[in-house]
Curated annotation (Swiss-Prot):
Residues reported to bind substrate: T10, K42, L74, R88
Subunit structure: Homohexamer.
Record function comment: Reversibly transfers an adenylyl group from ATP to 4'-phosphopantetheine, yielding dephospho-CoA (dPCoA) and pyrophosphate.
Major site of localization recorded for this protein: cytoplasm
Protein name: Phosphopantetheine adenylyltransferase
Source organism (scientific name): Hydrogenovibrio crunogenus (strain DSM 25203 / XCL-2) (Thiomicrospira crunogena)
Pathway: Cofactor biosynthesis; coenzyme A biosynthesis; CoA from (R)-pantothenate: step 4/5
Amino acid sequence: MSITAVYPGTFDPITCGHFDLIERAARFYDRLVIAVADNRNKTALFSLEKRVALAKEVTADMPNVEVIGFSGLLVDFVREIDGNVLLRGLRAVSDFEYEFQLASMNRKLAPEVETMFMTPAEQYAFISSSLVREISALGGDVSEFVHPVVAKALNEKQL
């Protein structure tokens, strides 16, 4: 049986923390789909198309990784692409309560889909897209926290 994992998020922008999780997860799943969400509840810095393009560039050398933009209910998207696993990252204990609630709701909506949690490597645990956006907006150097193509896109956005 082939296992397809789906790693959802807004990835606004995709960070080294995201990439670390993607790189490690790609070793365990036959197919890993990075599901870039068009979240109407959040105001994104980058358009959905740009976020998908950046994630594709960052993961270009990973043959079993696909990047797909989506809108709507996550479990519907997972079913659409024949996904088996929802992959979620936990940076800190504070993430757990929300993620546990989400996993429980997703299990209720799609009992055939399992949720798996991964923690980041220690050097990435403090990185978040919102902090990267804030540092960049204030003129700070984010090159340590994002892939060079993402840093370039952030710099261009601030001009």
